[in-house]
Amino acid sequence: MSYSIGVDYGTGSGRAFLVDTTNGKIIDKYIKPYTHGTIEKNLNGVKLPHSFSLQNGNDYMEVLEEGVPYLIESSGVNPEEIVGIGIDFTSSTVMFTDEHLEPIHNLPGFENNPHAYVKLWKHHGAQAEADQLFQTALDNKSRWLGYYGFNVSSEWMIPKIMEVMNKAPEVLEQTANIMEAGDWIVNKLTGQNVRSNCGLGFKSFWEENEGFHYDLFDKVDDQLSNVVREKVDAPIVKIGETVGQISEEMAEKLGLSTHTKVSPFIIDAHSSLLGIGSQQDKQMTMVIGTSTCHLMLNEQQHQVPGISGSVKGAIIPELYAYEAGQSAVGDLFEYIANQSPKAYVDEANERDISIFELLNEKVKDQMPGESGLIVLDWHNGNRSVLSAVSYTHLR
């Protein structure tokens, strides 16, 4: 028998699964909401701007350090039979660490600095920086811009780095490494310092043949190239390859064998294509969760307005992966439910049904638009062909 462990880091919780590799059956699972949740309103009593969405990196290690031992103990499997561990993660969820991979927010004096914390994928505090990067790329007729939907999102890594450069240089001074949170977990597992082609390709303007676009970075800010070169750039491991074996320290901590192999991290929505078998040219998959990602594979790379990236080998080796989607789906359902009047909540409780079930009952006979209410609000930003995350209402 052989088994593998997959750890899925979503927006609100982490989920670890033990899988039988011979048949794909899930043997057991462990789910843990993040201890500190998503930090959006205030940080340690200090109010945050409305566009901030932060997390505490320690929560991610808790999922790993509690989940993996639980799976081994509850299932009774021999750790020697666990051949591999894989990580998927929301993206671009960006971490700033010291040379020992310690999150900057854990260092003395930085516990109240919001820019020292993990910038979650739906953090939109870097809109000004994204606009600057986009305009510079447009002015310089950057060829690659069309492969990112002819726009630059504040959700991506480079604008978030620029935000810290502009707003918190003291954080950058302490930072040795900037990486996707998924890369951080992989590096903690292996004791290495590598990057996945999936995260870099989709969120950092990195291309397999050309690397980072330092020529553009130089025109955006005279410090940006050096920051990316010194703190982001690292050996690349592609999807389908192996980073290496788990370190002795982490093997002992998690109860795994040192023979356990670790894969490069893959963006959470992208991993779904592997799970459902959507691995062929011209197949599209909608991955629905907190947001919804529309993903498609193709043998060729095209410039498509409105997408948020196209990267070779980021899901399946040799195929280009395309991504587009809506930034708020599950989040939007939750938002609507939370606006329910007390009478609705009381009725749902009395009938022992969820507020979602009650709301569905009340609107099931209505046609779309029948009420006359039109809403164009800001919900995690906008990833349509408009790419206008500042839209908040009708004009």
What are these regions (language model features)?
Residues V375:
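Active-site diphosphate/adenylate-binding microenvironment
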Residues T392-H393:
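Conserved small/polar residues in nucleotide/adenosyl-binding loops
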